[in-house]
Each structure stands twice: as structure tokens, then as C-alpha cells.
Amino acid sequence: MQTQAQRFERGGATLVDEMFGSRADRHIVFLHGWGANRDSLRGIATLFQPTHHVHLIDLPGFGAAPLPPDGWSTIDYADLVQAYLLERISGPVILVGHSFGGRVTVRLAARRLPGIHAIVLMATPGLPASPLSKSGLRRWGIRTLRALLKLTRGLTGPGALAWHTRRFGSKDYLAAGPMRDLLVRVVNEDLTASAQDITCPALLMWGSDDRDTPPWLAYRYLELMNSHGTRATLDMLPHKDHFLYSGTGAHLCAFKIRGWLNVIDAVMDHAR
């Protein structure tokens, strides 16, 4: 497989794009999750090589891409990817985002760029849980305990906060290193308004056993999008977890995406 990787720089930030495929007029862009890189989506991306020009991207701070500037959020990531799309790609684009990459995809699709043909969100967070839900109550309890430990630091000592971080910090948080402040900002973002602004066709793909981004998020995204004019479809994959595209899941996900793209292309052709 012939591949070409190149850097794209804008505003002091850099992404790395690896391109391959046979069709110069149909582009599909893959955006990876937090703590991952373009290799994480290579298995599913290569399956689109016969039908699309494939773009595998390392977002700033991941893979071969250097750290982003201080103070970044998903808005800044979307700005960078948008600049890349406008400068490097001519023709309709399908965006496929997993987890964190899905957050960036939501931000981009909400801008209604004419070149974005459709989006695929895979196991994407970004919507707040109900305060009275199990996850909402747990989050409130964890934050309240941390606030109390900070107030009583003179009595409990610094070890109490360190214990709290080890006990309740996510794997991503514990491994984030210099990206930790960015991660905190990202996980506290609410993409509700952005989801409501999306008008292009959207496929939501989730694993029924996903504990990182539980299925209620998929149904909430579906509700938000379809109540505001989006042609959104949900495909819940039985017994799949957060990494629904891994292993044999790559072929299953690619099959589902291809089938969905054929349907929306037929609908659009009929509308013309």
C-alpha cells in the first residue's frame, strides 16, 4: 500500500496526515480518540482504500504531531482540521470520528461547511448526564469529595488529593501528562448546542457494552439531531465495547458505513 504522510501547520499547531486510496474525488477523513493516534484506526481505514481517498490524521499532541498551544479546546482542534479540509481537500468529505475525534467532528459538522458530505460518530462523548442519573450522581460525589479534600488539605495533607487522583482519575487523566489541563477542559465541554446545529447526514455507531461512552449518549445524540432536522441514524452493535472498530469489528463497521453511505447517496440523487 502506497502511503504519504505530511505535516499541516496553522496558527502554531501541527497535524500529521497520511493519505492513500484510489479515488481522488471521494475523501474520507478519520479522527482518532484521546490517547491514540492514526494507527488506531488504520484497520478500518484501509478497508475504504478501493472506494475513497483516505486521510488518517494525527491530531496535535498525539502520534507524530507535536503538542498543541496552551489553552486549547475542541474548538481549536476543529479550527485546525477545518483549515486542513479547505486547503488540502477538493470534493465531498466524509468525517469519521471516534471518541475525542468524534467531539471534533461534532464541532466541525455544526459549522455546516459545504464540503462535509456526511459524518460518522463512533462512541462519542460530549453530552452531560442527568444530575439525578447514576453517572451524574457519581460525578457530583467525586467532585464534592475532591473539593472537601482541598479545603481540609491542612488536616489531611497532600497525600489525600494524590489518593483521590489515583482512585477516581480515569486512565486517560492519569496518562495525560502535559495534556492533562486540556483533557480536563475537553471532558467538561457540553456539545448539546453543536449537535443541534448539525444538518448533514449522520451515522451514530456504538457498542452495546460500551462503558466509557454508554449507549444513553447515542440515544441522546440521536434525539438532539433528529429534533433539529438532521438525518441521523443509530447503529448499536451488540456485544461491542468502546473500541467497536478493533479486530474483526473493523470489517463490521466498514460494512455498516458503506451500506449507510449507499443509502444516503441514493436519497440525495433522488432529491436532485
Provide a role label for each language-model segment:
Residues E18-A64:
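Conserved HGGG/HGGXW glycine-rich cap/lid loop of the alpha/beta-hydrolase fold
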Residues H55-V96, S246-H251, F255:
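Active-site loop/oxyanion-hole signature of alpha/beta-hydrolase fold enzymes
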Residues D197-I198, L204-W206, D210:
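Short beta-strand/loop motif that positions the catalytic acidic residue
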Residues D209-T213, F243:
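Acidic catalytic loop of the alpha/beta-hydrolase fold
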Residues T230-R272:
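Catalytic active-site module of serine/aspartate enzymes centered on a nucleophile-bearing elbow/loop
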